[in-house]
Amino acid sequence: MYFQHSYRTQRIANEIHKKVSIILQHKIDDIRIGIPTISGVQVSKDLKNANIFVTFINKEGPEEIDTAVMILQRASRFIRFLLANTMCIRVAPILFFKYDSSLIEGAKVCSLISTTEKL
């Protein structure tokens, strides 16, 4: 359902990535979110849905991460409204925020590799 099939969906995904990053930096002022970083965006073929994958720099526990994702999901209608005002598309996609743990897992693998090299 969320495959980048055409050049247009890739362009829209990149544009959503840029715009939502700016919106999260300047318009969403909730301390519980912390510092969100968008690691990727997947848009459906019909451009009605978008999965936004986020990571958090200063969140460590699963409860904190779940709370931050839930807050972003609750704010998704407001973010969608701001996105629709800044993008030139007929219908703004419905936004679904999901936690992306790949960066943290990659950092753990790198630290394991560096410790084995020291031995």
UniProtKB/Swiss-Prot annotation:
Example GO biological process: maturation of SSU-rRNA
Described purpose of this protein according to its UniProt entry: One of several proteins that assist in the late maturation steps of the functional core of the 30S ribosomal subunit. Associates with free 30S ribosomal subunits (but not with 30S subunits that are part of 70S ribosomes or polysomes). Required for efficient processing of 16S rRNA. May interact with the 5'-terminal helix region of 16S rRNA.
Protein name in the entry: Ribosome-binding factor A
Subunit structure, interactors included: Monomer. Binds 30S ribosomal subunits, but not 50S ribosomal subunits or 70S ribosomes.
HAMAP family cross-referenced by the UniProt entry: RbfA
Pfam families: RBFA (PF02033)
Organism listed in the record: Blochmanniella pennsylvanica (strain BPEN)
Coiled-coil intervals, chain numbering: none
Gene from which the chain derives: rbfA
Localization annotation: Cytoplasm
One GO MF term attached to the UniProt entry: ribosomal small subunit binding
